[in-house]
């Protein structure tokens, strides 16, 4: 009997422990949220006062403000997407308050900087290089010039610090969390830039890239606030990118030039039209889409067309098919009704065969995108589910082609919905059940059922080039015949149009027989 009583008491104790663990986790999440909102959104609630209804209402309002800034679904609730953003390493400068606006800049163009101490994570020369290149990001688009000094007081004093440090009113929090902070132009701490020494700083390996973080913090030291443009350098969260190919977004350029102006204008040199080469090892695509039994690859003013299971590749001007379409398209996809949608900036066009449908272009916001979305990076329609994924920076939206509405619960981070695809997507399409994501000159074959990358290849693998050729390879603008792996690239518009017509005539005839 005693054994039964002991077992019963053990069972009651063991089973009652689970709700306590869950409650503790919820409390920890709420405390994390309170600290985050205090630091970055001026919540100004001290201590553990979350149970008060007034304070909880303030927290909900600040969560809504934070969700709106990061492009999340605005609910005021501490959902998983909101927590994920709060736990992402970021800059220590607030997103609102006096730092939520672009501040007055320096009253001079020639600025000095000094590195007070160095991180042991990197060679001194590598730190010098990262700092110099971080400043050059801004001097390349403004009249600003930066000079390094080794003694005395510089306009921008740079240091690696930990936790509470010196007279600085901001502090660091150990590994992860806050990576750095900087102060806007002015006397005293103005322009000073600090990096958290508890982080693992790196040039190109595992850890946090010093150049990327420094370039961001120097934006603050020059007077910029945070941007909610997810492609901007001044976006508050750390995004791992290839530093060698890192461009400032137009939002960054507009912001810094609103303070200091642009570079002196030089006489514009007439540009010769560039023609992309299929076997260029650095070839990238603006957009890719299927069209019935074809795949179309868009680049500048041109497109390549390949047919399923046929080795011929055709190369044409976009205008030879659709004269009213602009060049430099940014995204394209085929919907379940055999129509192509192509996107550039805030507009999209719908194509049926050789015809651009009337009443186009239309605004992308008619599809359900919020006003902050200014362009689409890539799009792909899953033929099985009839759902279209739109990629915008590090986020993706999902559109229901049957109801013509955006799905609830989106946007989501790309890496969350497509594990392994961690940063922005340049182009995407579906072929034989797989998604193909292009980023730069690489393409990732992705199994959407197992959510795994199954193959990594060059973007021009589809053209079966035997060996990459130099991108400066010369060829006739009117006609190029390149024999690579049995592929013949045709430039004659009349012949390509004839083939296109015959293929689709045979297809349509077979369907209705």
From Swiss-Prot:
Residues that bind Zn(2+) 2: 91, 216, 220, 226
SUPFAM superfamilies, sorted: Hemopexin-like domain (SSF50923), Metalloproteases ('zincins'), catalytic domain (SSF55486), PGBD-like (SSF47090)
Positions bound to Ca(2+) 3: 173-174, 178, 196, 199
Motif Cysteine switch mapped to chain: 89-96
Tissue: Expressed in B-cells. Expressed in a subset of endometrial macrophages related to menstruation and in ovarian and peritoneal endometriotic lesions (at protein level).
Record text about domains: The conserved cysteine present in the cysteine-switch motif binds the catalytic zinc ion, thus inhibiting the enzyme. The dissociation of the cysteine from the zinc ion upon the activation-peptide release activates the enzyme.
Coiled-coil segments on the chain, per record: none
Residues engaged in binding Ca(2+) 4: 286, 377, 426
Protein's name according to its UniProt entry: Matrix metalloproteinase-27
Annotated propeptide span(s): 18-98
Signal peptide: 1-17
Effect upon mutating residue 55 to Q: Loss of N-glycosylation
Originating organism: Homo sapiens (Human)
Residues with glycosylation annotation: 55, 110, 452
């Amino acid at each position: 009997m005693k054994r039964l009583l002991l077992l019963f008491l053990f069972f009651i104790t063991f089973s009652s422990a689970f709700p306590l663990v869950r409650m503790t986790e919820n409390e920890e999440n709420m405390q994390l949220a309170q600290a985050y909102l205090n630091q970055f959104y001026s919540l100004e609630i001290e201590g553990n006062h979350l149970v008060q209804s007034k304070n909880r209402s303030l927290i909900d309002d600040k969560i809504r403000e934070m969700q709106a800034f990061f492009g999340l679904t605005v609910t005021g609730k501490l959902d998983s997407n909101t927590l994920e953003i709060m736990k992402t390493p970021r800059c220590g400068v607030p997103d609102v308050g006096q730092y939520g606006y672009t501040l007055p800049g320096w009253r001079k163009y020639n600025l000095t900087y000094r590195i007070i101490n160095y991180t042991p994570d990197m060679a001194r020369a590598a730190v010098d290089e990262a700092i110099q290149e971080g400043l050059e990001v801004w001097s390349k688009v403004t009249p600003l010039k930066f000079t390094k000094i080794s003694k005395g007081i510089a306009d921008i004093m740079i240091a690696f610090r930990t936790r509470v440090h010196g007279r600085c009113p901001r502090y660091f929090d150990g590994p992860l969390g806050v990576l750095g902070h900087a102060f806007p132009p002015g006397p005293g701490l103005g322009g000073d830039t600090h990096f958290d020494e508890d982080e693992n700083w790196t040039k190109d390996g595992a850890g946090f890239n010093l150049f990327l973080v420094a370039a961001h913090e120097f934006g603050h030291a020059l007077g910029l606030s945070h941007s909610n443009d997810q492609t901007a350098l001044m976006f508050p969260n750390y995004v791992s990118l290839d530093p060698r190919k890192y461009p400032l977004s137009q939002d960054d350029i507009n912001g810094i030039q609103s303070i200091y102006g642009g570079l002196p204008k030089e006489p514009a040199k007439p540009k010769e039209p560039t023609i992309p080469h299929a076997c260029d090892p650095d070839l990238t695509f603006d957009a890719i889409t299927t069209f019935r039994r074809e795949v179309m690859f868009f680049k500048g003013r041109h497109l390549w067309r390949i047919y399923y299971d046929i080795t011929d590749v055709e190369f044409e001007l976009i205008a030879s098919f659709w004269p009213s379409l602009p060049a430099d398209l940014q995204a394209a996809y085929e919907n379940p009704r055999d129509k192509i949608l192509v996107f550039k900036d805030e507009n999209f066009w719908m194509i049926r065969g050789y015809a651009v449908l009337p009443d186009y272009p239309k605004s992308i916001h008619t599809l359900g995108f919020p006003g902050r979305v200014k362009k689409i990076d890539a799009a792909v329609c899953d033929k099985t589910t009839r759902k279209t994924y739109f990629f915008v920076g590090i986020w993706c939206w999902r559109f229901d082609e049957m109801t013509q509405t955006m799905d609830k619960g989106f946007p989501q981070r790309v890496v969350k919905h497509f594990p392994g695809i961690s940063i922005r997507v340049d182009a995407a399409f579906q072929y034989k059940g797989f998604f193909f994501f292009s980023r730069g000159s690489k393409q990732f074959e992705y199994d959407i059922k197992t959510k795994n990358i199954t193959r990594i290849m060059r973007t021009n693998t589809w053209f079966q080039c035997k060996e990459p050729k130099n991108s400066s390879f010369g060829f006739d603008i009117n006609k190029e015949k390149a024999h690579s792996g049995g592929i013949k690239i045709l430039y004659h518009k009349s012949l390509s149009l004839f083939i296109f017509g015959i293929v689709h005539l045979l297809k349509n005839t077979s369907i209705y027989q």
